[in-house]
């Protein structure tokens, strides 16, 4: 990094450094972040120290692995800075997870499990991620390790890896995500919609948790997710022999999401411009009531979940012929294009995962402890937020220059926007600029 860029980084890190207290920690934090941003094939402690400060390896290792400082305070500052940069009603909060392939069995949380990035089972660690995003600019603000069952059942193994006592109980990925959302809400981060794939959307407790927090959401679901027509009614069944019924039952049977949209009207839409032109797919949407109420036996039909809250059921038919299904609690008056654009905004978190790994070494940490892994992940997120702040500043500077030519237009020439208007054009973002050499 140049002297000017190093100074710029140090200034940007000032609110983070203020929370670290001790001067040694305030010196190691910028050094670690600079190592992540700078050139080099490996972004673990030893090679970063060798490149930047050969005499500081022990201090840098101590800072990330065992130093006494509260990472929760820096996580809060990261959320505050991300909100300052892109928070608002047009911003989305994307829930996902990412896998870090590993060899051996001693690194915290490592186990054979499904790795979404690889599309198969692999020996890896899985981190639940929260990404704040607006237009084409994502900022990751949360990475929390998921502990598989074979770790939860081994207290000695967890103790050896330094897993905190309050993190040793079994928690599903959706439960971890809800806890992280609570942390983000406590930091007053502003966003309009929560997005998640079917790994989270199939969880009724996750959707109910979002509802309980008063959040707007759009989530993927499997094609067999059961729903009811929106006009379903609860009625008393006709009494037969035996005891009379004490509970209402739905007057219609639930259907799979796939079957519910079989006769729906599909429209081909473009939700945003890609590098090769408009991105298009066919979409259909109907209002339904989700079958996630209490289970009840209904005659010879067996157990069925009762109708729950009303929501949008959305189908996507891709050019390849593949179909995807979603549920969303957006208002009933929202149009199909807005639904499609909202759902498809989730893609940007995959870009963030890739950049944190390829550019900043998220998966390069060589330690085995809970604390070290989460601190390394936190430093990569802080480095990523810094780089995104530079991208945003560069893009906003260009936008201001373009606006000068339109300064003479009257206010009356500008159309008013409704609350749920079609998504505005994305700010044209320059590429992420690390100091790593390009392949």
Q: What spans do the regions from the language model cover?
A:
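An anionic, glycine-rich sequence signature occurring as long contiguous blocks
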Residues: 10, 119, 133-162, 166-169, ...
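Short, surface-exposed basic-aromatic patches at helix termini and helix-loop junctions that form
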Residues: 186, 206-216
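Short, basic/hydrophobic alpha-helical segments
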Residues: 77-82, 163-192
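Basic, low-complexity segments
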Residues: 1-20
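Electropositive nucleic-acid engagement tracts
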Residues: 20-26, 31-105, 112, 218, ...
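Short, solvent-exposed helix-loop connector elements
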Residues: 205, 328, 335-343, 358-375, ...
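Active-site-proximal, Lys/Arg-enriched surface segment
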Residues: 65-149, 154, 159-160, 295-302
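Short, conserved catalytic/metal-binding motifs centered on acidic residues
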Residues: 48-49, 89-103, 130, 193-202, ...
């Amino acid at each position: 990094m140049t002297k000017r860029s190093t100074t710029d980084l140090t200034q940007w890190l000032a609110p983070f450094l203020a929370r670290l207290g001790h001067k040694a920690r305030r010196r190691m934090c910028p050094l670690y972040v600079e190592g992540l941003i700078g050139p080099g094939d490996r972004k673990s402690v030893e090679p970063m120290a060798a490149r930047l400060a050969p005499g500081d390896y022990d201090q840098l290792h101590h800072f990330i692995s065992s130093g006494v400082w509260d990472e929760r305070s820096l996580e809060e500052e990261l959320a505050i800075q991300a909100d300052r940069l892109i928070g608002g009603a047009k911003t989305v909060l994307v829930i996902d997870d990412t896998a870090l392939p590993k060899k051996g069995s001693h690194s915290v949380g490592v186990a054979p499990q499904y790795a979404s990035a690889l599309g198969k089972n692999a020996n890896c660690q899985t981190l639940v991620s929260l990404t704040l995003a607006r237009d084409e600019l994502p900022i990751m603000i949360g990475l929390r390790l998921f502990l598989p069952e074979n770790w939860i059942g081994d207290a000695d193994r967890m103790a050896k890896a330094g897993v905190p006592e309050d993190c040793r109980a079994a928690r599903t990925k959706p439960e971890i995500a809800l806890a992280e959302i609570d942390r983000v809400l406590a930091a007053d981060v502003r966003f309009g919609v929560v997005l998640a794939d079917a790994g989270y959307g199939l969880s009724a407790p996750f959707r109910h948790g979002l509802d309980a927090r008063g959040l707007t959401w759009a989530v993927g679901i499997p094609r067999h997710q059961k729903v009811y027509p929106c006009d379903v009614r609860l009625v008393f069944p006709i009494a037969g022999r035996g005891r009379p019924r004490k509970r209402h039952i739905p007057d219609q049977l639930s259907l799979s999401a796939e079957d519910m949209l079989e006769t729906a009207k599909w429209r081909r839409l473009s939700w945003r411009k890609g590098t090769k032109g408009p991105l298009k797919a066919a979409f259909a949407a109907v209002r339904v009531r989700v079958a996630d109420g209490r289970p009840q036996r209904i005659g010879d039909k067996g157990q069925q979940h009762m109708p729950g809250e009303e929501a949008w059921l959305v189908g996507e038919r891709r050019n390849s012929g593949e179909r995807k299904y979603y549920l969303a609690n957006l208002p009933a008056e929202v149009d199909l294009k807005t639904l499609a654009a909202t759902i498809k905004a989730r893609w940007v978190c995959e870009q963030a995962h890739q950049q944190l790994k390829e550019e900043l070494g998220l998966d390069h940490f060589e330690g085995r402890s809970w604390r070290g892994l989460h601190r390394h992940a936190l430093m990569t997120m802080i480095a990523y937020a810094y780089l995104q702040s530079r991208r945003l500043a560069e893009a906003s500077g260009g936008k201001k220059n373009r606006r000068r030519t339109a300064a003479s237009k009257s206010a009356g020439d500008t159309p008013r926007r409704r609350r749920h208007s079609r998504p505005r054009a994305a700010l044209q973002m320059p590429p992420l600029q690390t100091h790593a050499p390009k392949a």
